[in-house]
Structure formats: C-alpha cells, structure tokens
UniProtKB/Swiss-Prot annotation:
UniProt protein name: Asparagine--tRNA ligase, cytoplasmic 2
Lineage: Eukaryota, Viridiplantae, Streptophyta, Embryophyta, Tracheophyta
Annotated signal peptide: none
Family affiliation: Belongs to the class-II aminoacyl-tRNA synthetase family.
GO molecular function: asparagine-tRNA ligase activity; ATP binding
Length: 638
C-alpha cells in the first residue's frame, strides 16, 4: 500500500527542476497551481506568455506617474529689502528645490515598486464619464485566485486595457481572464515571486458590490451558510473543499487497492429500520374531489397572509443588507430574531387556513398502492443492505453516496443529508471490519497531510493550529480498542466529572461520554465495540452471550463517531426473529432474508461519514461547513 500510495502523493509539482508550462486540460488557460506550486514558486517562468483566469481576491489602483511639477518661481528681492530678506528668500528657494527633487524620486520609486498612493474610490467625474476632464490613468494590481491552489497571482493591468469602469473592475469577486507576460516583481520587498503583466483582458465578469455578499470584510463561516452558492470563493472554504476532494480520492485509492469493487446502490428504497426516514411520494396534496372545501382563512388578529409575507420579504432584504454592511453581530441577531417571529405568525395563519380548507392529507390516510412505485418508499439512510447482495457475489464491495436522516435536530453535528463511504466484505467477522476501519482511517489522515499540505497549513492558521500534529499522531499510531463494558467501567470511575446521563450498562453512550473518553482520558481516537443488543440495529449479529452484538464505533476527539461498523447476522432464524422483535413488517425484508436462505455467509462492513471525517481533518466546529450545500432541520436554502 505504501508504494501504491506514493504514486498518488503530491498533486502539485515538487520537482527540483522546473517543468515547462502546460495548459489546463479542456481549457485554453494555465491553472495557477501550474505557475505557483513549483519548487521555485514560478520564478523560472519569467518572460513566458500565458493566459490565466480567476476571481479578484483583492485590488488596488495606483495613479500613473505624471510629469514633475515645475520648480516654484520666487521673485527677486528688491534693493530696499536688505540682506536678511535676501537670505530668507534664498533659503526658501533651496528648501523648495530639495522637496521637489525628493518628490520626483518618490514617484520614481512608486512606479518601480508598484506602491504609491492608492485610489480605491474614484472621483465622481470619472465614474460619471464626464468628458470635460480627462479621466486619470491607473495601474491596477489584482490578486487573482482560480481555485486550483491556495496561492494567488498578482496581475498588473493598465487601465487603458479595460472598457469596464474602474470601480467594477476592482470589485471583489470580479472574474478576469487576462493574457500577458510573467515577470519578476519590480519591488524588491514584494511578497510574491512572480506576477503577470497583462497585455489583454479577454473577459471581465463584473459583480454588483451592493448585492454581492462577499464584497465586504471577511464573513464568519456561520454567516456564509446563507450564501452557500458563493462561499467556495472564500479562501477557507476553498481549502476545505480541496481537502474534501483529497479524502474522496483517498477513499477510492485505498479501497480499490485492497480489492473492493465499486457498486452504486439506490437512493430510493423500500427498506426501513434506520430511525426517522424521509418518505418518497407523489400523493401529498391530492384530496377527495367530493370533499367540501371551505374558504381559506386569510387573516389572524387583523393581519392578512399577503401582508405578513410582504413584511417577511422586506425584513429578509434588511437582514441581507446588514450582513453585507459593517453592522455588528448583535444587530444582525436581533433582526433575525424579529424575522423568525414574523415567520411564526405567517405559519400560524397558514396552518389555520389549511385546517379550515380540509385539503391537508395525512400520510397514514394515503393509499400508497396508487403511488408512483405502488408501495411505501423512502430516501435511504444506509446502503449496506444492498451492498450485502453484491458482497455475496463479488466478495468485497463499497459505495459512496448520500444518506438521509429525518431527525428533527439542529445542532453542530447533525445533517439531514450526509455522504457516506460504505463497505461490505464476505467471509469477514467483527475483528476484520475493525482492522479495515483502523487502516482506512489512518490512511486518510496520512494522505491529506502528504497531498494537501499547503491547504492544511492555511487551515491550521485560520481554523485549528493543532490539526497537523493531531493527524500525524493518528497516522503513525495504533488505535486503542475497548469493549462497551470496559468503557462503562472507565466512565464510572470518573470522579471529577459529573455526567448528565449516568453511565450504566445498557445505556447508549452519549456525546459527553465519548468526549470524555477521547478528549480527557486517551486524547486520541479509540474504537468501542461489542454493544448491548438493545442499542444497536436488529441486523447486527447476536453474540453467543445473547446480550451483546458485534458492532463497533471509531470515535475521535472533538467530533465523535466517524466510522461505524458491524458483523451482520447471517443466520436466517435469528435474523427473522429479531425483525419480529423490532416490530417491523416482515414483508419489507423478504428480499433481505433471501440472502440468508440461499448461500448465506458471514460478512461485515463499515460506514464512514465523510463530513465527520472532514471535521476531524480540518478542525471545523460545525458539520454544516463540511458539506457544499447543507440540509438540516428547517434549512434548505438552494
């Protein structure tokens, strides 16, 4: 695995000898990582002509050098002024000459260094395009990012190249495609090694600074969630996304190398047994035509629903404005709270309206035989059932896809839609599954450190300074394993901590229990296995003691459970009995029982939550920042 993993290491160029510039595949431009993620940081490419594209991260404008002003003319002293006056006049002339000369040198230095006086806001006459006064000419200095790397490229643009007004060209988020020549910075103190002197602007995609949410100062992550379609343009979310991509590639790399076959499993399923699930139906909203419909209730306490909706729209617009402005968080929070109360009022009016019209259909009254699929269907919460059928033929299989849980919980660790990597292995028992989880987890930690080092350095500075040390320690050590019974005993010995849920045998381990175990006692990831059968799913294999089942959780500090796994029940009689004990309809599991009727075999598997893994790898505190478009209870913005 080591030799194979090395072939995938270092996505950027770390060779000592600089390579020639190559165009981005399927594009007529050069990716910035090709220029900047080299051993020489691009210095060896000076003089090369390239086309680059990206979005403006910062911008400044410097007025072009104008001719030096003429020396001041001072009248000669009159003969009657006396010697003292003549001496004073001579001193003034000398001082002014020195100041004038120093101003010339200062302007010359500004041109060479790219510094000088900046003009982020332009005169009204220039913006209005008045012809009476010729607009001043500027040199623009942009920092451009194209998302291929943590690094940005400085692009120098003469204002004469652009037909777009200066304020629009310089707005944060503007997309620019430029052709020019790479050069070494003129300023010796420049932080960057290479820059592009633009000769052509091939494309300018402007933004409206008044409406673009990223136009203002850096927004915190929790506020960026309202603009999930724009937040990947921020440096932090861009780095997190590249780490996410690396974890995905690492998962395929590890599993393919170890002989797992990739299988697609359905998102729509008839199988239940995984907690609250989303129902799939086309019947909601349909009513009996014979049912008398009463006129809707339009008002509550003198407020019409249309009026309330108009107020909601205005309050939403105000909150958007506050978020883009420099308003403090307390003001924004107060406005959001006020909007919530208005939304609650609208909900009350609509609920009363629906209760009066008699058009609301309850799910239990629906005839699902008339539904699209002719029966109850749900969004899947796990793909392991379907993987079992392929493991019974191919031996080792895996899948990667969305999983849906309808728990009405809104906190930093819950999502309604998550993405899981799931495996299933025939001829494997619980210890085999734990070994697989152990090696897979450590491989992910090592892969991220070796292949996304620049992003990890940035995230370490911006989010969590301990992530690199934590991942290095995890990748190089063996994970400790404890039975559930041993964990309960450890928790009961904790004399300095009082738990809200008393640790007793048979009680499900809570977040505070797991946090104490990983953050306080062992300060690292651990595996907890052999749980009481009452707190795990019915399909997990029953142990010989008839009290425990063959399940495990891989738990990490600050995050909680990242990987779950189990050896599933292969014995028909026991599985059939446990389905009945759990209160499920046997009919829904006939296909699953068939796998035990015909050619049954011992098998086990694991399920990794990609979002939880990303939290551990980056130190992010909230799972809603670990997925591109978060869906949680009450929130689905786009």
């Amino acid at each position: 695995m080591e030799s194979h993993g090395k072939t995938h290491q270092k996505e950027h160029d770390n060779d000592l000898s600089p390579k020639p510039i190559t165009l981005s595949k399927y594009s007529k431009r050069v990716e910035l990582k090709t220029l900047l993620d080299r051993s020489d940081r691009g210095a060896g490419l000076a003089g090369k002509r390239v086309v680059i594209g990206g979005w403006v991260k910062s911008a400044r404008a410097v007025k072009k050098n104008s001719p030096p002003p003429p020396l001041p003319v001072v009248a000669a002293p009159s003969p009657s002024s006396g010697g003292d006056q003549a001496h004073t006049t001579a001193n003034i002339r000398c001082t002014e000459i020195i100041q004038s000369k120093m101003n010339i040198f200062k302007r010359f230095f500004d041109v060479l260094s790219g510094g000088g006086k900046t003009y982020p806001i332009f005169d009204k006459t220039e913006l209005a395009g008045q012809k009476a006064v010729p607009p001043p000419e500027y040199v623009f200095y942009f920092l451009i990012s194209d998302g291929s790397s943590i690094s940005s490229l400085q692009v120098v643009v003469d204002s004469a190249l652009s037909t777009v007004p200066a304020t629009q060209l310089m707005a944060l988020g503007t997309c620019i495609v430029a052709e020019g020549v790479l050069r070494l910075p003129l300023a010796a103190s420049a932080k960057h090694v290479i820059e592009l002197e633009a000769e052509k602007l091939l494309h300018v995609g402007t933004v409206d600074p008044e409406k673009y949410p990223l136009s203002k100062k850096q927004l915190p992550l929790h506020m960026l969630r309202d603009f999930s379609h724009f937040r990947p343009r921020t440096t932090t979310v861009g780095s997190v996304t590249r780490v996410h991509s690396a974890l995905t590639l690492a998962s395929h790399t590890f599993l393919q190398y170890h002989g797992f076959q990739y299988v697609q499993v359905p998102v729509i399923t008839t199988t239940t047994g995984f907690g609250e699930m989303f129902r799939v139906t086309t019947l909601l909203g349909k009513t009996d035509d014979k049912e008398e419909k009463k006129p809707p209730v339009q008002e509550k306490d003198g407020f019409s629903i249309d009026t309330v909706k108009a107020v909601i729209k205005e309050k939403t617009r105000l909150i958007d404005h506050l978020k883009r402005s420099d308003s403090n968080r307390e003001t924004v929070v107060a406005a959001v709270h006020d909007l919530k109360k208005t939304n609650d009022l609208a909900s009350q009016i609509e609920m009363k309206q629906k209760s009066k019209t008699g058009t609301l259909v309850k799910p239990e009254k629906l005839d699902f035989s008339k539904d699209f699929f002719g029966r109850d269907t749900y969004l899947t919460a796990s793909g392991r059932f379907h993987l079992e059928s392929y493991a019974s033929a191919l031996g080792k299989v895996y899948t990667f896809g969305p999983r849906f849980i309808a728990d009405k919980i809104d906190n930093a660790r819950h999502l309604a839609e998550k993405w899981n990597v799931e495996t299933e292995m025939a001829f494997a028992e619980l210890d085999d599954a734990m070994d697989c989880a152990d090696e897979y987890f450590k491989f992910l930690c090592k892969y991220v450190l070796e292949n996304r080092d620049e992003d990890m350095k940035f995230i370490s500075k911006r989010v969590d300074k301990t992530i690199t040390t934590r991942l290095e320690a995890t990748a190089s050590s063996s994970l400790l394993r404890f039975s559930y019974t041993e964990v309960i005993s450890l928790l009961q010995k904790a004399t300095t901590t009082k738990f809200e849920t008393k640790p007793e045998w048979g009680v499900a381990l809570t977040t505070e229990h797991l946090s104490y175990l990983t953050d306080e006692i062992y300060k690292g990831p651990v595996i907890v296995h052999t749980y009481p059968k009452a707190i795990k799913q019915f399909y997990v294999r029953l142990n010989d003691d008839k009290k425990t089942v063959a399940a495990f959780d891989l738990v990490v500090p600050k995050v909680g459970v990242v990987i779950t796994g189990s050896q599933n029940e292969e014995r028909f009689e026991i599985l059939d009995a446990r389905i009945g004990e759990s209160g499920f309809t046997r009919e829904k599991f006939e296909w699953y029982l068939d796998l035990r009727r015909h050619g049954t075999v011992k098998h086990s598997g694991i399920s990794l939550s990609m979002e939880q893994m990303l939290l551990y790898a980056t130190g992010l505190p909230d799972i809603k920042d670990a997925i591109p478009f978060p869906r949680s209870w009450g929130k689905a913005n786009n």
